[in-house]
Amino acid sequence: PVANYASDLENAKKAIVGHYAHYDVVAYEDTTTKTTMRTFIISYGFTDFYLEGGKLMQSDRFVHAEQKISTKNVKSGLSDKAVQAIKPRVHEVELTLVDGKWQMYRSATPSLLGISGDPLKPLSTDPNDPNLTDPDHDGHPGVTVKISVGNFFSGEIYITRREIFSNYLTLNADGTLSGYVVDKSEQFVVGASKKILAQPSNSVQHPDYGLSPVLLVPISADIDTPEELMQIRDSLFPREPEFKTN
């Protein structure tokens, strides 16, 4: 817990330094489909805060993600290898005291997934771009998303992404940090295992940020593997959101 809720900036920074379990949800809408498809992507990982020359730095490492889709019987998912290939840049965070509570802002630092190049430039839309990479090492360009529709159909799409997210968090009295994520990422479908799947798909975040929460919970520094995190997931985080299916 944050002892005597830090009233000055330096003590607030020191209070935040540590190793955290990371949970976030991003709610997306894809209007390129016949009926709007909504998706929750729930990400798990570790966030570390440390001081460097008086600056409070944030480092993130993602280990596992779940995808929930509003369309009945449609499932999709990224392998843990693909999730672990997402490498946000270490970045300074800003702290401000608002109404007696410390607010933290992590600004967007674009990073590329499935393609190399300049992350500050728009994502390439060339399916034969020579800079395509295979970070999940499955022999296909970009990262692979597996898709299934009931028992009738399954396939894969191969995507690249330019991850662009920022966090707005509040330091709570119990030492947790909670808030929401703003995601302006870009996605490009490089190819697919079946022609029907090779369609543009670029979901945008749902405008209600309440559907895209972030929760960081301080944990012991020796808990640092995906297996250890997922073992204690239920004791740290809320239940994953679900879509109501008729």
Cite the ranges covered by each PLM segment.
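Predominantly extracellular/secreted and cell-surface proteins with exposed
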Residues: F40-N172
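Glycine-centered flexibility motif
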Residues: G18, H137-P141, G179
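Edge beta-strand at a domain terminus
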Residues: A3-L9, N151-N246
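Tryptophan-anchored aromatic micro-motifs
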Residues: V2-D48, K55-N73, R106, V181
